């Protein structure tokens, strides 16, 4: 559709310029008897069209100025868009049985491809320097809504494949939406604060998110000893242990780093903290978790499925080591270092 619109715009501009030079020397054709009435002759530098043959509907009325006229509609098909003023190009009329394409946009906008028939409507155009991902496929949950500012949106996931790292940009990174049949991804975020993942039903609830330079310890695991709580200050937090599966590297960027949430069927991971922190992607059941987004210009590869993943990437500030895997006793919790005191883990859902 984008290529068609661009080609039509170029053809309309070139034809309008060539017709404007020759119209003053040409005369409008006379009306043929037994055929519908043609358009009246026009004054000025306007292109003149021949009258339509019988059995077809009447074309659009003439326009003034340097305008390009689209072809008259065919019978049995919907009417094309009305004419426009100024040096504008006219798009082709829509085809029957297919949804209407997206309207043209102005400014520095990037529009995704229009949806195919039988599939949900694509996202609406946005203003500003935003980049919109492709529209979701049918039968899958809707991706997160667009965000304002210089934010980039991750592409929707494909079923049956591990999720790759979403794009980076700005002070905020949005995780990709979840797969079908799985819990909904995190809502959009505004400002320099990231939102914690939504609670899973039937599982212990994580403590609510916090603001400032506080670091929250992970909630207690049922039937397992409590891990050491994280320390406050400008230190990234290690991801929580997952029983029987290796942990991927945590994200980087900002003053604090949030570990990815656990997969379904496992206890809830630690909530997010305030500040310039990226949000990890939601969990995918039975599939390896891709690395969460990173800040800055650091490329990251998704981990291969079924293989243990390497140590977390180094950041500017000191990192906390990974807690021991589940099922093994853990040592005493270290005291909090610097910053504000951390909040003890809670098991009640956030109010």
UniProtKB/Swiss-Prot annotation:
Function text: Acts as a receptor for the Gram-negative bacterium F.nucleatum.
Residue numbers carrying Phosphoserine: 24
PANTHER family (UniProt xref): BASIC SALIVARY PROLINE-RICH PROTEIN 3, PROLINE-RICH PROTEIN
Sequence repeats: 53-73, 74-94, 95-115, 116-136, 137-157, 158-178, 179-199, 200-220, 221-241, 242-261, 263-283, 284-304
Post-translational modification: N- and O-glycosylated; contains about 50% carbohydrate. This is composed of highly fucosylated N-linked saccharides, the major structure is a biantennary asialosaccharide containing 2 fucose residues on one antenna and an unsubstituted terminal lactosamine sequence on the other. The Gram-negative bacterium F.nucleatum binds to carbohydrates containing unsubstituted GalBeta1,4GlcNAc residues. N-glycosylation on Asn-87 is prevalent in head and neck cancer patients.
Protein known as: Basic salivary proline-rich protein 3
UniProt xrefs under SMART domains: Pro-rich
Signal peptide start and end residues: 1-16
InterPro entries registered for this protein in UniProt: Pro-rich (IPR026086)
Composition bias, Low complexity: 99-111
Modified residues (Pyrrolidone carboxylic acid): 17
Subcellular location: Secreted
GO biological process: defense response to Gram-negative bacterium
One Pfam match: Pro-rich
Biased composition (Polar residues): 20-31
Single GO cellular component term: extracellular region
Region described as 12 X 21 AA tandem repeats of [RHP]-P-G-K-P-[EQ]-G-[PQS]-P-[PS]-Q-[GE]-G-N-[QK]-[SP]-[QR]-[GR]-P-P-P: spans on this chain: 53-304
Biased composition (Pro residues): 70-84, 112-126, 133-147, 154-168, 175-189, 196-210, 217-252, 259-270, 279-351
Record's keyword terms, sorted: Glycoprotein, Phosphoprotein, Pyrrolidone carboxylic acid, Repeat, Secreted, Signal
Organism: Homo sapiens
Domain of life the protein comes from: Eukaryota
């Amino acid at each position: 559709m984008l290529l068609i619109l661009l080609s039509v715009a170029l053809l309309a501009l070139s034809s309008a310029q060539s017709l404007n030079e020759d119209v003053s020397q040409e005369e409008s054709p006379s009306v043929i008897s037994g055929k519908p009435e043609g358009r009246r002759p026009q004054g000025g530098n306007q292109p003149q069209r021949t009258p339509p043959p019988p059995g077809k509907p009447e074309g659009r009325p003439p326009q003034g100025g340097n305008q390009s006229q689209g072809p008259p509609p065919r019978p049995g098909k919907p009417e094309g868009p009305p004419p426009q003023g100024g040096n504008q190009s006219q798009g082709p009329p829509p085809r029957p049985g297919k949804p209407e394409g997206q309207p043209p946009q102005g400014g520095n906008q990037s529009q995704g491809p229009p949806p195919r028939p039988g599939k949900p409507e694509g996202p609406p155009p946005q203003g500003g320097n935003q980049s919109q991902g492709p529209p979701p496929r049918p039968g899958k949950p809707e991706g997160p809504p667009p965000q304002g500012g210089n934010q980039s949106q991750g592409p929707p996931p494909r079923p049956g494949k591990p999720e790759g790292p979403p794009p980076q940009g700005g002070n905020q990174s949005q995780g990709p939406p979840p797969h079908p049949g799985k819990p909904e991804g995190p809502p959009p975020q505004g400002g320099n604060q990231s939102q914690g993942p939504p609670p899973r039903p039937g599982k212990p609830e994580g403590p609510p998110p916090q603001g400032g330079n506080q670091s929250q310890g992970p909630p207690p695991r049922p039937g397992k000893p409590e891990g050491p709580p994280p320390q406050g200050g400008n230190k990234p937090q290690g991801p929580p242990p997952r029983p029987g599966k290796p942990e991927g590297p945590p994200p980087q960027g900002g003053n604090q780093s949030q570990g990815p949430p656990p997969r379904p069927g496992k206890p809830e991971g630690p909530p997010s903290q305030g500040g310039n922190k990226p949000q990890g992607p939601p969990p995918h059941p039975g599939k390896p978790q891709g690395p969460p987004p990173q800040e800055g210009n650091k490329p990251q590869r998704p981990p291969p499925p079924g293989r243990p993943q390497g140590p977390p990437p180094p950041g500017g500030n000191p990192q906390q080591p990974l807690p021991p895997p589940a099922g093994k006793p853990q040592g005493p919790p270290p005291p909090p270092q610097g910053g504000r005191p951390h909040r003890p883990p809670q098991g009640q859902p956030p109010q």
